[in-house]
Amino acid sequence: MRQVIVAVLAGFILAGCVQKFPGPITVKPEPINISEQEVKAKIDNFYSECSKLKDAFKCKRAADDIYKSGDFRSAAIAYDMVCYGFQYIPACKQLADMFAHGDGMPRDIDTAVTIYQIACNNGDNNSCDLARNLRVQNQNR
């Protein structure tokens, strides 16, 4: 009986270890312009919703919805909140991607590298590669 329980628990643990993070957003929407008041209202609403959810995955999905609407400024703030509030690597990577590509903000390679490095230090090997590649590209300019 003990072996069955151990086997079942091992299965649950392994299933949790191989759980995939949501993939990156692959289609970049058209950016929209919104006022500072609209950004503040959207972020206040996001913060309230995310505080109720208390779930990094669901909060990142809500930030993805903001991004997909084309409101990159609000999305960057939302990803920042999820990245640093939950230490949720997919949100950190999306924020770094936004800095690397200049989505809704001036392109900032140094900030992108810093955020990718945070994700790398938390075990995301892809972020290590992205940080290294951006450093090399930046040095060659």
Regions found by a protein language model. Name each.
Residues 58, 91, 127-129:
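TPR alpha-solenoid repeat register
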